[in-house]
Swiss-Prot record:
Keyword rRNA-binding: no
Function: Catalyzes the 2'-O-methylation at nucleotide C2498 in 23S rRNA.
Underlying gene: rlmM
Annotated S-adenosyl-L-methionine binding sites: S188, C221, P222, G223, G224, D240, D260, D276
Record-given protein name: Ribosomal RNA large subunit methyltransferase M
EC number: 2.1.1.186
Length: 374
């Protein structure tokens, strides 16, 4: 198995291919990407044996922007016999994976492939039993062992492979299953909820998304992102010249400032800054840098709207510029970006300041005083 399969949003195969080619080369792994437009996945074929496994282990999945999932696969299995689809799949995995912890029978995220989902769910049960019988899978699921993947791209045609549980997406098809809240102001609320799932480890939610925290939402109207912050019992300053939905204002947790998000200056410190404004990505990232450099927030989640062409290059340049500005100002920060399932022509970025790395900075001293006061 010397191919890497990467799931992505249909229409972004070229961006996904450009990214994996760049990231692989940085690890001195070389190959070429096979791209089929609107297929929802990309194949990266490595020139050297075992290089796909090297990428699956050493290339941090969290650093990939356009990939929803990353796995090692073999040759395409074609024309699986309807009377026995299981034997060829088991044969390809025999001796490749031992003691896998989970089986996922998946499809690309396309309208055509979704017709196969019902089959995949039914097929999973007998296939899992057969793989356990030959010890490719453990008898019980184990979240710390490799995940076995079967990716059906058409009836009777699939790629078979595996991913490492500590370097993949934990979600089926790489997509978190979120339910739209009936009382949310807009569907954009799911973007921020998904961002929390992707960027913030579940065991850190109470600490980093806790009750009573202070947050600012730039470009808040009508309140989709503010809704998520309110649900986490935060106190929110909503910045927008437009109206907020009355239900959010009635909570008593939201203060609405009718102001331009690019001109607003907070009076105090904040734990969170979120921003989903429709503006050029360079302008938004510069605004985020200003907030972080001035110590106006600890963490930020924001969207960068993508141009029609050179989308990977545009995002890479904006992230590099942001990182450089923070570095020049003595800010030690973690930066991550991902095109989420609920994103469209955009990517979502998360920045977290690393506290204690820059002792004595003005903003750190102010936070320490506030913590002592509280």
């Amino acid at each position: 198995m010397n191919r890497l399969a990467l799931y992505c949003r249909p229409g972004f195969e070229k961006e996904c291919a450009a990214e994996i080619t760049d990231k692989a080369a940085a690890l001195e792994v070389y190959g070429f990407a096979r791209v089929k437009e609107n297929s929802g996945y990309v194949l990266f074929e490595c020139y050297q044996p075992d290089d796909a496994d090297t990428l699956a282990r050493k290339l941090p999945f969290r650093e990939l922007i356009f990939a929803r999932q990353m796995l090692v696969v073999g040759e395409l299995l074609k024309d699986l016999p309807p009377e026995d689809r299981i034997a060829p799949i088991c044969g390809m995995l025999l001796g490749v994976v031992e003691g896998g912890g989970e089986l996922r029978v998946e499809v690309p995220d396309t309208n055509e492939s979704k017709e196969l989902l019902k089959f995949c769910r039914k097929f999973t049960v007998p296939l899992r039993a057969a793989l356990r019988e030959q010890r490719t899978l453990l008898r019980q699921e184990n979240p710390y062992r490799p995940v076995v993947h079967v990716l059906f791209i058409a009836p009777g045609c699939c790629y078979v492979g595996y991913s490492y549980s500590d370097n993949n997406s934990p979600f089926y098809m790489g997509i978190p299953r979120l339910k739209f809240p009936a009382d949310a102001p807009s569907r954009s609320t799911l973007k921020l909820e998904e961002a929390f799932h992707v960027f913030i480890p579940a065991d850190e939610w109470d600490e980093r998304l806790g009750s009573g925290m202070r947050a600012v939402d730039l470009g808040a109207c009508p309140g989709g992102w503010t809704y998520q912050l309110v649900q986490r019992s935060m106190m929110v300053q909503a910045i927008d010249n437009g109206p907020m939905v009355p239900s959010l204002m009635e909570t008593g947790q939201v203060t609405h400032h009718r102001a331009d998000g690019f001109r607003f200056t907070p009076e105090g410190d904040n734990d969170w800054l979120v921003c989903d404004m429709v503006e050029k990505p360079a302008k938004v990232s510069a605004l985020m840098a200003r907030w972080l450099v001035n110590g106006w927030c600890r963490e930020a989640i924001f969207n960068l709207k993508l141009p029609m062409k050179k989308r990977y290059e545009e995002v890479s340049q904006n992230l590099a510029t942001l990182a450089q500005v923070l570095k020049e100002n003595g800010i030690n920060a973690q930066i991550a970006a991902k095109q989420l399932y609920h994103d469209r022509e955009e990517v979502t970025v998360h920045v977290r300041r690393i506290w204690g790395a820059i002792p004595g900075r003005r903003d750190e001293r102010e936070f320490r005083r506030r913590e002592q006061r509280d």
